[in-house]
Amino acid sequence: MRIRYGWELALAALLVIEIVAFGAINPRMLDLNMLLFSTSDFICIGIVALPLTMVIVSGGIDISFGSTIGLCAIALGVLFQSGVPMPLAILLTLLLGALCGLINAGLIIYTKVNPLVITLGTLYLFAGSALLLSGMAGATGYEGIGGFPMAFTDFANLDVLGLPVPLIIFLICLLVFWLWLHKTHAGRNVFLIGQSPRVALYSAIPVNRTLCALYAMTGLASAVAAVLLVSYFGSARSDLGASFLMPAITAVVLGGANIYGGSGSIIGTAIAVLLVGYLQQGLQMAGVPNQVSSALSGALLIVVVVGRSVSLHRQQIKEWLARRANNPLP
């Protein structure tokens, strides 16, 4: 295997070590069915993190996806409550997610303002819209909208060939986004845009169209996550995506993406999602409080990112150490 997959292999090895270590504490962690079906608790983070990787590779960022999930979730509930057939309500919810992404892209392209600032604004815009819809539907505060058909609420809890449906959808997204980013001309354009937007523009690369596609895909993935979460919990709430921001960005960075753009890996992000998700699961099964598990997750991110930085710059570090050895301080 080529050296460029070295980081992904290191993450995979770390994932195996993590599972074995938690399995030594609690043998249930080594049960295959438990490992597969526990992914339903966190795999929606991965569904959003995959297209987010491409946005970050392009030199942008989107921190509004959590609010997009909440808006799409409550919109699905309101549509169903209003008598819209469930298939049509799901389709309209997916279109709403893509529209949220296009709003982000349009504001970024035409205002030339930093994507972090724009998506911070839309984060509050979409969150406020979700609360407004929730209030209009009579679901005050964070009270959910329920009463969905059993066929819909069972969907996210089904399994096909022994695999839970949310995990299957994640694997399909993984394949599609990996092929698009790493095996197509359009995907190569994303890397070029992240490395130098000006050069990409002068090279006749459709920068604006590419950015619209990337942010729309992130919005669409957020809507898919919203539909799965509503099905999984049986309730549409405006706060469903509130806790997704940091885990998703952590997975993208941990997976090898450069936060300044120009490099990243879909496979790396996918493995990092499992790494972070199983870390939380393992700590909970070990009886560790949530506050401590969050701190440990942050510590893991710091250690791994520092390790990756050392790995990437090991030649410069060796040269610096050699110079210090030859010229010791008095």
Swiss-Prot record:
Induction description: In the absence of AI-2, repressed by LsrR. Induced by AI-2, via release of the LsrR repressor. In the absence of glucose, induced by cAMP-CRP by direct binding to the upstream region of the lsr promoter.
GO biological process: autoinducer AI-2 transmembrane transport; quorum sensing
Gene Ontology molecular function, alphabetical: transmembrane transporter activity
Pfam families per record: BPD_transp_2
Family to which the UniProt record says this protein belongs: Belongs to the binding-protein-dependent transport system permease family. AraH/RbsC subfamily.
Assembly and binders: The complex is composed of two ATP-binding proteins (LsrA), two transmembrane proteins (LsrC and LsrD) and a solute-binding protein (LsrB).
Biological function: Part of the ABC transporter complex LsrABCD involved in autoinducer 2 (AI-2) import. Probably responsible for the translocation of the substrate across the membrane.
NCBIfam families: PRK15038.1
Name listed for the protein in its UniProt record: Autoinducer 2 import system permease protein LsrD
Organism of provenance: Escherichia coli (strain K12)
Primary gene name: lsrD
